[in-house]
A protein has these predicted regions:
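Walker A/P-loop NTP-binding motif of AAA+ ATPase domains
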Residues: 2, 41-42, 62-65
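Extended repeat-based solenoid scaffolds, especially LRR ectodomains
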Residues: 50-67, 73, 77
Length: 168
């Protein structure tokens, strides 16, 4: 809930964050919350099946949402050099919600002045998960009899990926 509150402050009262002396420390906390934590994963028995639950997913989504909000509301106060590697790890995740947020962040970075220079050194790291997402999702839709909702979700993910590539 702290990250959601931070996102609200960044969206509506970003001048409070900009004037804060610990603004740069805030980025370190956000980056720390984008990491996958194994201690927040658990396995649930569902009769003959076992399902892995990632309790850290909402935290990671909230952290990436805060980053996106800060890029949108106060781009001049954001040092995009700091989170290119975190962006690559977010693109490599299994969860499509996190990937879509990272694609959106990538598009925002490319729209910023001279921000393309930030992503070019790590372009290979970004393209591997991007290509994997496109190929895997297309393969999944074509080989399975997916329902309309999952087809739409895959379509949105692919559209976000293509838009991110186009922005580069």
């Amino acid at each position: 809930s702290t990250l959601i509150t931070l996102n609200t402050i960044a969206h509506h009262h970003h001048s409070m964050l900009q004037s804060s002396t610990s603004f740069q420390d805030l980025w370190l906390v956000l980056f720390d919350h984008t990491k996958i934590r194994e201690d927040l994963k658990r396995t649930v028995n569902l009769g003959p099946f076992k399902e892995k639950i990632d309790d850290g997913l909402p935290i990671r989504k909230a952290a990436y949402t805060c980053i996106l909000t800060m890029l949108t509301t106060m781009p001049s106060h954001v040092d995009v050099n700091r989170f290119a590697s975190y962006l690559a790890s977010g693109l490599a995740e299994r969860e499509s919600d996190v990937k879509m947020l990272c694609y959106h962040i990538m598009t925002k970075i490319c729209a910023m002045v001279n921000a393309r220079d930030v992503l070019m050194p790590v372009l290979d790291d970004l393209m591997v998960p991007l290509a994997r997402t496109i190929n895997k999702r297309l393969d999944k839709v074509l080989k399975t009899k997916a329902n309309e909702a999952s087809i739409q979700r895959v379509r949105q993910l692919l559209f976000s990926a293509v838009r991110a590539v186009e922005s580069l």
